[in-house]
Every structure is written in structure tokens, then in C-alpha cells.
Amino acid sequence: PRVGRQRAERLFSSFLAAQPTYEVVELLVGAGLAAKLAAGVADTLGPDAARRLRDDPWALLSLSGVALVDADRLAIAVLTGADRQDTRRGRAIVGLTLRTATRAGHTVLPADLVVAALQAEGISDPVTAIVAAVESGDVLEHEPPEPEDDEGEPDPALRTLSLARYGMAEELVAEAIARLMATAERIADPASVRSV
């Protein structure tokens, strides 16, 4: 069948637009992973997804439904001398742990639980992994609340971590509630309000 000029240009444009996805497919298939992940990777990581995966194969974990073993397989395929102690791997495990907790309804996790998850995945220096995740801007570290008495120091065991987007949202909500509480006027005497 004959293809008109306009249709040929559309087909060619579509082919060029899909080029980043084809590059990702090449990486994934080379690592023995399903090619069907490529569209999601390209959507999540953008037009330079293949380069980003070559630089940090554990970025694959930013997609839902991808397991650590898949990202490790990709790392072995694209990195010479891939190492389980790589800080990029540790940073990705921190993010994966927090995303998993978020799906279960926990937007903030105690740092001790994140350390335990890192150790369970064989990360020998979990503190470095957490620092890398915080420095990347994807994770927020929340300081423990100040103790009621002036003499006590905050308990470092109460440090928590969250994904940045949820941590910032919760902080904004908390600030708004504090502002409302500070400016609100009482509309009824507490004694006149019946308990529920």
C-alpha cells in the first residue's frame, strides 16, 4: 500500500518520539528484564531515561512493581564491577522502603526501621545510605520533638524519615493547623459542650 507524505511524516515523528523507550527496552532486555517496563521507565525518568539508568540502574526502583532483584540485575548488566554496597543502591533502598510504607499508610518511618531494612538487604553502612537519600532531596529527615523539660536532649531514637513530597505536605498541614489554633477564638464555653 502506498503511504502519503503526511502519514509518512506522522509515522516518522512517532518513531522518533518512541526512541527513548526503544533505548530503555534495549537495556532491560539485555539484563533479562521484561520489555513491558520500558514505557513506565521512560514516562517516569523522562526522555533521557536510558542514560539515567546507565548512570544509576537502581533508579528502576522508582517504578511501582519493580523488585530490588530486578534493579540489581540491571546494575550487573550495565555497570562494570557492580557492588551491593554502592551508595546508589542504598539510597534507592531507602526510597523503596519509604514508598512501601507509604502504600501501607505510613508516610513517616522511624529511622531505626529504615536502618533495619537496609541491613536486611545487606547494606553494611546504613547511615551513609540514609545521608545519600537525604542529600538527593527525595527523602526528608525529621528531628525528634523537643522534650517537655528544658534540661533533656531529644531522643535520637525518635528520628524519622519520609519521602520529601509527603513530609513537606504534612509539615504544611501542621503549620496551618498551628496557625488556626493560635488565631482561633473560642465559640463556646468548654463546660457547656457535652462530651460525645
Language-model regions, residue ranges each:
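Accessory alpha-helical DNA-binding modules that contact the DNA backbone or grooves
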Residues: 1-159
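ASCE P-loop NTPase motor cores of helicases and related translocases
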Residues: 120, 124-127, 148-196
